[in-house]
Amino acid sequence: MNILIQNRLIFLFLILWLWTGCATKPDFTAGEQPLDLTVRPEALPVRGSIWPGESASNMLFADKKARYINDIVTILINEASQGGNKATTNTSRDSDSAAGIDAFWGLDQSILSRNVNMGSKIKIGGSSSSTLKGTGNTTRGGQLKGTVTARVVRVLDNGNLVIEGRRQLTINEEDQYLIISGIIRPEDITTENCIFSQYIADARIVYAGKGIINDKMRPGWATRIVDWVWPF
């Protein structure tokens, strides 16, 4: 019987091992996607006019801020977040009850008189108490600083700019990606053509990577299988 159970366990682990071997590891390919190099179509000059149309290069009093598609702007990333939650529960309950019965299904009262400790009536009593105390506390924080140059990919009807920027860094076969996208207002751009990440609406900031270091941060497949199967 023990040999049969042992063989079943070996067969089960063999199936799990083959199943994990067939699984493919998802790769982080967000930084490898080709850039959208959409060029804004140039406005054709009006017949009989030499004005080529509005652009950043022919404005007499315009600065070099990003305004049009494919213009670039530098994003100063300085993100910090911190949150906490605390809960405390304290409950208590006590109850007592007592009852006396003169007659109980024709029980002979002489039985009570024979024992002085029982008294003259049938008595029923009980008490209960319960106490519950619980405390929970969680804290989480994160911080990200960096600089990345983004490109204007769309100009909205109200003049706001949709931007997208990516940076890929490879060191010793370890790839790191920094991706940022969102919507900015031209008036929030400084004279140095920079903008802080706090001024980006619908901001999406991704900082991730893949490589040996990233793989070592994850538990092995056997540990993950045991954690998934283990019910306790």
Curated annotation (Swiss-Prot):
Keyword Transmembrane in record: no
HAMAP family: FlgH
GO annotation terms (biological process): bacterial-type flagellum-dependent cell motility
Membrane topology per record: Lipid-anchor
GO CC field: bacterial-type flagellum basal body, distal rod, L ring; cell outer membrane
Lipid-attached positions, S-diacylglycerol cysteine: 22
Keywords for this protein: Bacterial flagellum, Cell outer membrane, Lipoprotein, Membrane, Palmitate, Signal
One of the record's GO molecular function terms: cytoskeletal motor activity
Function: Assembles around the rod to form the L-ring and probably protects the motor/basal body from shearing forces during rotation.
Signal peptide limits: 1-21
Highest taxon listed in the record's lineage: Bacteria
Protein's cellular compartments: Cell outer membrane; Bacterial flagellum basal body
Lipidation residue positions, type N-palmitoyl cysteine: 22
Keyword DNA damage: no
Subunit structure: The basal body constitutes a major portion of the flagellar organelle and consists of four rings (L,P,S, and M) mounted on a central rod.
Name of this chain's protein: Flagellar L-ring protein
Family to which the UniProt record says this protein belongs: Belongs to the FlgH family.
Record PANTHER family: FLAGELLAR L-RING PROTEIN
